[in-house]
A protein has these predicted regions:
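Loop/turn elements at helix/coil->beta-strand transitions in domains of secreted/extracellular proteins
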Residues: 2-7, 40-45, 81-86, 121-128, ...
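Extracytoplasmic/secreted envelope proteins and their assembly/folding machinery
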Residues: 7, 27-31, 67-74, 99-102, ...
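Active-site loop/turn elements of alpha/beta-hydrolase fold enzymes
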Residues: 46-51, 132
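Alpha/beta-hydrolase active-site loop
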Residues: 58-80
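Helical cap/lid subdomain of alpha/beta-hydrolase-fold lipid enzymes
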Residues: 67-71, 102-277
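Gly/Ala-rich beta-loop-alpha elbow adjacent to hydrolase catalytic centers
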Residues: 89-94, 98-99, 131
Length: 277
């Protein structure tokens, strides 16, 4: 019996659906919190994509294989549960994979080209993105593009310049005016297509993320802020993985209660709704 909107969890690069190691902690904490607060196992879903070998992280891209598989998984959950909508909680590379599988359309991947189909927006209630690289990653500028995950087509390339600023992606403030850098084709397309991910979209990240670095800045804007976001939460002290592992209660608040968590002590620097563009 389904009484809650089912939740699908999508992990990031070299992580897993559930805890398997210190570096691949999965969604175990979040799933347990939801179970402790009235959800049943029939309402919570996660699947692993890729492997947990961190040395393979630089090889992963937004390819057809993973996007088609994850989209089929979302459709299977909708079909299996019979629910009119599902919600997605995503982390790291899972954010951009999740956004693309919902938006649908063409993918020009390193493993070939494919079409994901029509947008699934009408079937997604809440989309939560934790520590995503929506505008790319500054570590991918310049020579970083030599790594597949940083490529200019379907990777995390942030662009090498913006205005007169060159190879200074993570500086804040930027020395010169910056307006509209050219970056990863897939990311640029997603950020400008005006296709929403869900009825309600939330973004959350940490100012001291040890993977994204640079205070989450990419050419003067937070890369973890999904353009269509209704609200955002900015943490002060969490690592990249802790932004997922230590925020189960906040995830529940945003996805189930559909509101923002209250700022508490020093953990949250900002918890606010985002004005519509």
């Amino acid at each position: 019996m389904i009484t809650h909107t089912p939740v699908i969890f999508i992990h990031g690069n070299s992580d897993a659906a559930l805890h398997v190691s210190k570096t691949a902690t999965g969604w175990t904490n979040s799933i347990q919190y939801f179970l402790d607060n009235g959800y049943t196992q029939a309402e919570l879903y996660a699947t692993s994509w890729g492997d947990t070998n961190t040395s393979n992280a630089v090889k992963r891209t937004h390819n057809c294989r993973d996007l088609l598989r994850l989209r089929r998984f979302v459709l299977a959950v909708l079909d299996y549960t019979g629910a009119p909508k599902v919600s997605l909680i995503t982390h790291s590379m899972g954010v951009t994979l999740g956004r693309k599988l919902i938006k649908g359309g063409a993918v020009n991947g390193n493993d070939g080209s494919c079409n994901l189909g029509n947008p699934l927006t009408s079937k997604i209630d809440v989309f939560l993105g934790l520590a995503g690289g929506n505008y790319g990653l500054c570590n991918c500028e310049g020579a970083g593009t030599l790594e597949p995950t940083c490529n200019k087509k379907n990777g995390f390339w942030p662009g090498d310049s913006c205005g007169l600023n060159t190879y200074t992606c993570g500086l804040k403030p930027l020395p010169f005016p910056c307006n509209g850098p050219t970056y990863s084709s897939l990311l640029m397309s997603m950020n400008t297509d005006n296709v929403r991910e869900a009825s309600l979209v939330f973004s959350a990240w940490s100012e001291v993320d040890d993977l994204i670095l640079y205070g989450d800045q990419v050419w003067g804007r937070p890369t973890s802020l999904i353009p269509s976001s209704s609200g955002k939460v900015v943490y002060t002290s969490y690592t990249h993985m802790q932004t997922k592992e230590n925020t189960a209660a906040d995830q529940y608040t945003m996805v189930v209660k559909k509101t923002l968590p209250s700022p508490r002590s020093s953990e949250i620097d900002d918890s606010s709704f985002v004005p519509a563009n």
